[in-house]
Amino acid sequence: MQVTVETLEGLERRLNITVPAANIEDAVTAELRNIAKNRRFDGFRKGKVPMKMVAKMYGKAVRQDVMGEVMQRHFIEAIVKEKINPAGAPTFAPVENNEGADLVFNATFEVYPEVELKGLENITVEKPAVEVKEADVEEMIETLRKQQATWTEVEAAADAGSRATIDFVGSIDGEEFEGGKAENFPLEMGAGRMIPGFEDGIVGKTAGMEFEIEVNFPEDYHAENLKGKAAKFSIKLNKVEARELPELNEEFVSKFGAAEGVEGLKAEVRKNMERELKQAVKNRIKEQAIDGLVNENNIDVPSALIDQEIGVLRQQAAQRFGGNTEAADQLPRELFEEQAKRRVVVGLLLGEVIKTEELKADDEKVKAIIEEMATAYEDPTEVIAYYEQNEQMMNNMRNVALEEQAIDAIIAKAQVSDKEVSFNELMNQQPA
């Protein structure tokens, strides 16, 4: 076998491979003999059919099958010989494919980029300095009360804390637009569900009133045809309701299964908030470390890997929205391309960190991750046992631990400082 390697554009490579004719003919002959030996032919005893007849009947198809197998096998031998690491499946193209002559073909594919990590010392990470304060717990308790609140119809004017039930019809330049009409729509005032100015036009109005308001859709509104447009809404206020919060007593506490009364509920709420806070701090640090890693290391990305990741994201999107996963390929590629490329880049860079630092999943870290996750469940010991008895789940956790160790390795070389933030600031912070 003769092999030459061509470097094409970017990460694309082409192998030019020559396979001796004897290899092809020997493989074709062997397969034809196998057919002659094992298949029945009318007028002949099994295994006694003339080879010329078998070759005439099956020779073309057998040669095609042999060529495909030979190209695949010799491609693998070639990449091992040349120490090449393909990032996706090759495209084969025969160049010379005449019976009795050497087979000459090429295989075109992409390779993984050569990654040399740099700039880790330039990465800046602001570690959130935050704790759950008593006021945070009280605010969370108040949120729980609001979730259990009842609404009572009142004759008062609508204000920021009330719920208004309205009919409305929206129009732009006198024309109604899709999605701009509703009847008996319950609107919790102050929740910020509507576009800016909409709720303001309802404040101070009482049930039975009919009126119009004029607002502008934001420039970043999700519907392209409404971005930045001036709109008029005709509104009828059907009902105004006031929120009635439940008493913070034993009856209220019992709804959450907390022991030891109100103080027990507060303790349970604090415990949950501290667990969520710990994860949020970890996520914020990880996000900054990865952003810095990506910004400092610009690498080429194999399109084959991006295509694979787009396929994964399409399937996840279809499952998340209860759609037909078989139709996932119909979802527009543009929806996922940027995220897919980012995932591939991050995966390649973290993989290089793991390789460079010679990291292996730490068993104690794996155990700690599982135990911490199990605290969110009613019976942590049962969850831990489930993971320990499931090898696939354990492998997933080893990968999680390995990624965390890679992040730790980045942080160890980065510029890290503390930044004081409140619980709400951190929890409401949107990922970059």
UniProtKB/Swiss-Prot annotation:
Report the EC code(s) recorded for this entry: 5.2.1.8
Every PPIase FKBP-type domain range: 161-246
* Statement: the UniProt record of this protein carries the keyword Chaperone: yes
* Entry GO terms, CC: cytoplasm
Detail the disulphide connectivity of this chain as listed in its UniProt entry. none
Q: Where in the cell is the protein located?
A: Cytoplasm
**Reaction catalysed by this chain?**
[protein]-peptidylproline (omega=180) = [protein]-peptidylproline (omega=0)
Database matches in Pfam families: FKBP_C (PF00254), Trigger_C (PF05698), Trigger_N (PF05697)
Which InterPro entries does the annotation name?
A: PPIase_dom_sf (IPR046357), PPIase_FKBP_dom (IPR001179), Trig_fac (IPR005215), Trigger_fac_C (IPR008880), Trigger_fac_C_sf (IPR037041), Trigger_fac_ribosome-bd_bac (IPR008881), Trigger_fac_ribosome-bd_sf (IPR036611), Trigger_fact/SurA_dom_sf (IPR027304)
Q: Keywords assigned by UniProt?
A: Cell cycle, Cell division, Chaperone, Cytoplasm, Isomerase, Rotamase
- One GO term of the biological process aspect: 'de novo' cotranslational protein folding
Molecular-function annotations in GO: peptidyl-prolyl cis-trans isomerase activity; protein folding chaperone; ribosome binding
Q: Kindly give the PROSITE patterns that the UniProt entry links to this protein.
A: FKBP_PPIASE (PS50059)
Q: What class of enzyme is it?
A: isomerase
Record comment regarding domains: Consists of 3 domains; the N-terminus binds the ribosome, the middle domain has PPIase activity, while the C-terminus has intrinsic chaperone activity on its own.
Which protein family is it in?
Belongs to the FKBP-type PPIase family. Tig subfamily.
Give a short account of what the protein does.
Answer: Involved in protein export. Acts as a chaperone by maintaining the newly synthesized protein in an open conformation. Functions as a peptidyl-prolyl cis-trans isomerase.
The protein's name: Trigger factor
Organism placement in taxonomy:
Bacteria, Pseudomonadati, Pseudomonadota, Gammaproteobacteria, Vibrionales
| Gene expressing this chain | tig
